[in-house]
Amino acid sequence: MTTERTALFAGSFDPFTVGHESIVARGLEIFDRIVIGVGVNAQKRAWMTPEERVSAIRELYAGEPRVSVMQFGCLTAQAAAECGARFLLRGVR
C-alpha cells in the first residue's frame, strides 16, 4: 500500500481558469500528486472538446511532474479509483 497522497480534481474545465490553477497550486501544498480529471458530459454544451481541454491543461502543467491529467466519463468516485486517488480536491463556489 502506497502512502502517497493523491487527489483527484474533477470538473468540466471549459475553460480551465486562473481560479482552477489556484486550487491546484494550493492542493500541491497538501497532496503529493494531483490528477486533474476532465469530465465528459455529452448533455452539456462545451466551448472546447474534451481532448482540447486535456491537451491545454497538460501543456500548462508540463513542467510539474506531480500533476497529471485524465479524461473521464464515469462517476467521479470511479475516476478516483481508476487513478488511485484517495482524496478529492474541491474549491468553494
Question: Where is each model-derived feature located?
Answer:
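Nucleotidyltransferase catalytic core that binds NTPs
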Residues: 1-93
